[in-house]
Amino acid sequence: MPKKLSKRFKEALAKVDQNQTYAPLEALQLLKETATAKFNESAEAHIRLGIDPKYTDQQLRTTVSLPKGTGQEVRVAVIARGEKVQEANNAGADIVGSEELIEEIFKGMMDFEVLIATPDMMPKVAKLGRLLGPRGLMPSPKGGTVTADLTNAITEFKAGKLEFRADRTGIVHVMFGKASFTPEDLLANLKALQETVDRNRPSGAKGRYWRSVFVSASMGPSIAVDINALRDLKLTEV
């Protein structure tokens, strides 16, 4: 049975022409106008790429540093031992531990958005793969979350660095700020995301790489973005 649309959503939907592709800044202004829920909604990007992630040379998993931040506090957990524990604490990690933290996570403790591990701890962290993998939280070198440079990694993730990947259908879903951001700040973050996706194009990607880009507030309607206009935009213009 079709889900009944709320009055709020219908009013937001009426502001968007579903047959139109919008210039990037106009799309983000619309995103703000359609963020009418009673909380500060996230700004989301949904990017459909011409890749088939079932092939290893068509997988996309990387990180983006959002120049205007994420708009939310990011809780970082670190698995390390020895002097690296103190380094992680000094750098501002929210949760730090060794084998005991691995056991806590194994039992279901998930009070963090980012999990970083030092390389020497990865053989022990491996047991968490089935638990963390589906949640996108498993530390990985590609994601910048397996590293000996804990100070830099913690600082970057706290400041707005995000890990993302294409799902099994080749779509990237990323929260790139809050609806309370200015359109210009949202555009700076969206541009950084676009450049990162282009820079990390999988070697096996063939044909047209960019298929579609939609943005939305987390409780709002989808707004189609002009891909070429976004890619042609220079960051100095943002």
Swiss-Prot record:
Keywords of the record: Repressor, Ribonucleoprotein, Ribosomal protein, RNA-binding, rRNA-binding, Translation regulation, tRNA-binding
Annotated GO biological process: regulation of translation; translation
Organism domain of life: Bacteria
GO MF assignments: rRNA binding; structural constituent of ribosome; tRNA binding
Keyword Ribonucleoprotein among UniProt keywords: yes
Position of the signal peptide: none
Keyword Heme: no
Cellular component aspect of the GO annotation: large ribosomal subunit
CDD domains: Ribosomal_L1
Matching SUPFAM superfamilies: Ribosomal protein L1
InterPro entries reported for this sequence: Ribosom_uL1_bac-type, Ribosomal_uL1, Ribosomal_uL1-like, Ribosomal_uL1/biogenesis, Ribosomal_uL1_3-a/b-sand, Ribosomal_uL1_CS
Gene3D superfamilies, per database record: 3.30.190.20, 3.40.50.790
Function: Binds directly to 23S rRNA. The L1 stalk is quite mobile in the ribosome, and is involved in E site tRNA release.
Record-linked HAMAP family: Ribosomal_uL1_B
Assembly notes: Part of the 50S ribosomal subunit.
Identification of the protein by name: Large ribosomal subunit protein uL1
Organism annotation: Rippkaea orientalis (strain PCC 8801 / RF-1)
Lineage, highest ranks first: Bacteria, Bacillati, Cyanobacteriota, Cyanophyceae, Oscillatoriophycideae
